[in-house]
Amino acid sequence: MKHLYFLAICLLSTFSSQAKQVNPELTALAQQYFNTMVATQAPNATNKELEAFLALLTDDVANQHLPYQTDDSREPDGKAMMRKGMTFYLGAHTEYQANLLDTFIFNDSAIALRYTHHAKGIHPQNQQEIEYTQTIMDVLEIEDGNIAVIRKYHE
């Protein structure tokens, strides 16, 4: 009976420790994504910050930002399109703050980050003042260690 009890304890502790193990590479990628994404939104952001963020992405990355961008198709020039779009808004904020609330790692294929952010600035297209505070969930699909799909959801 002692041996069965001991075996049961060993099995439970093994399963418990395996359930708690999280892919350290994806954990690091999640933090790097958040840090570089936040850096691109800073008032003093430059192409250096933008390129550090883009370096995490596949060349054919898909970017879906609901409800504004509903297409999540991966295109051969996905990264180039993101570079163009993000360059247009680069430096538009006069204030930007973000706070990471939760990070979720799903096996080796996905990351979800939930965060709040507050931004203030001038919209570069219409020169109107903007200010907003939101809670966002970014869901990232991972392929060969890079981010292949970004989906942004607003709370």
Functional labels for PLM-detected ranges:
Residues 53, 61, 82, 113, ...:
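Hydrophobic pocket/interface hotspot
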Residues 96-99, 131-137:
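Short, surface-exposed coil-to-beta transition loops
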Residues 24, 54-107:
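A solvent-exposed, acidic/Ser-Thr-rich amphipathic alpha-helical stretch
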Residues 5-14:
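Bacterial N-terminal signal peptides
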Residues 107-119:
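A short hydrophobic beta-strand element
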Residues 91-95, 119-131:
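Short, cysteine-centered beta-strand-loop-beta hairpins and adjacent loop/turn segments enriched
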Residues 110, 133-155:
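Short beta-strand edge/turn micro-motifs at domain boundaries
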Residues 17-56:
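Short, low-complexity N-terminal intrinsically disordered segments enriched in polar/charged residues
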